[in-house]
Amino acid sequence: MIKVASITKVEDGSIVTPKGFSAIGTAIGLKKGKKDLGAIVCDVPASCAAVYTTNQIQAAPLQVTKDSITTEGKLQAIIVNSGNANACTGMKGLQDAYEMRALGAEHFGLKEKYVAVASTGVIGVPLPMDIIRKGIVTLIPAKEENGAHSFSEAILTTDLITKETCYEMIIDGKKVMIAGVAKGSGMIHPNMATMLSFITTDARIEHDVLQTALSQITNHTFNQITVDGDTSTNDMVIAMASGLSETKPIDMEHADWETFVFALQKVCEDLAKKIAQDGEGATKLIEVNVLGVQTNEEAKKIAKQIVGSSLVKTAIHGEDPNWGRIISSIGQSEVAINPNTIDITLQSISVLKNSEPQTFSEEEMKERLQEDEIVINVYLHLGKETGSAWGCDLSYEYVKINACYRT
């Protein structure tokens, strides 16, 4: 049983709150007038885990990071640039990514295999290595919160807000910290995709155990968000565990294993929601919960089908309670359902009961649809499993942003 009372959100926490971590973000000239290069550094080689995009076209930095992590399952630094994806840049792009790793290792005095690299931005443009070379040597990570916040700014592209979260958990009666930072706004339809996320913790946990937990939780969080249905070439989630907390090693047999997993899930869920809420041109976060299904996978599939529907997204943007678009999406999900037993609530107002339309106050509904967060609940009465997905509305601004992205 998960000890929820053993987990507390730390409102002013960041990726440098867990013991052993420091961070920095700075402007080196990849983006005009904005921070565009950052680093997270650990005092010791940290156990690590990662989940990557499933796009068959994988960017050079992602390939280099895979190479680093598979060597020992440890990392000590992550270097990230924004403004340039270093994707579809051929062999030269791969060489540049390896050089970026080598430059970081030299600057921080680390083994190359302990350094990961990540890039995000425009695809198909060579990475300006003269700028990268001059920039990396200026990185001086700080253990203070301003270092973490500057890093969160340096990894942004079309994002409007930074995305950070932090939790404290009790393991073996002692405080253990876990935190995360992310970027992502457009081209979001992960399996894993369209976003970068970096998680730090001082938990004592080995690479393979952390990988199991991260892979499992990613399927319930990051893989359940969608903004525009496009899957990126670059993006990934990396978790680093310094092991500097004074607890016994955490594994699946540990009495507090579920506490750790729940805390990791909360970090990933917080970041996933922030990404969905910050979707390009978004004005509303949409949460879809599907209940009463035979399997969790089926529930998640239906939820993602609904939240990814352009017609549902535009209806929410227009504050139109058009539940017909919701039930149509349910039918398109390819999950076997009973079309006669569907209940739907929109902002806790019943709009469909046993697949029959319900009378509701248009005035009350309009008022609730003006809120920033919209919740759609679907009850299928087929089983006991549930699943959720997150997305955002689709606005005129989304088209403007993406029509002019390169300019």
Swiss-Prot record:
The record's subcellular location field reads: Cytoplasm
Q: Name one GO molecular function term.
A: glutamate N-acetyltransferase activity
Q: Where is the active site?
A: 194
Q: Which controlled-vocabulary keywords does the entry list? A: Acyltransferase, Amino-acid biosynthesis, Arginine biosynthesis, Autocatalytic cleavage, Cytoplasm, Multifunctional enzyme, Transferase
Pathway field of the UniProt record reads: Amino-acid biosynthesis; L-arginine biosynthesis; L-ornithine and N-acetyl-L-glutamate from L-glutamate and N(2)-acetyl-L-ornithine (cyclic): step 1/1; Amino-acid biosynthesis; L-arginine biosynthesis; N(2)-acetyl-L-ornithine from L-glutamate: step 1/4
Q: Which InterPro entries match?
A: Arg_biosynth_ArgJ (IPR002813), ArgJ-like_dom_sf (IPR016117), ArgJ_beta_C (IPR042195)
TM regions (residue ranges) = none
Site (Involved in the stabilization of negative charge on the oxyanion by the formation of the oxyanion hole) found at 120-121
Q: What class of enzyme is it?
A: transferase
| Cleavable signal peptide | none
Q: Which family does it belong to?
A: Belongs to the ArgJ family.
Function, as annotated, reads: Catalyzes two activities which are involved in the cyclic version of arginine biosynthesis: the synthesis of N-acetylglutamate from glutamate and acetyl-CoA as the acetyl donor, and of ornithine by transacetylation between N(2)-acetylornithine and glutamate.
Can you name this protein? Arginine biosynthesis bifunctional protein ArgJ
Q: Which gene encodes it?
A: argJ
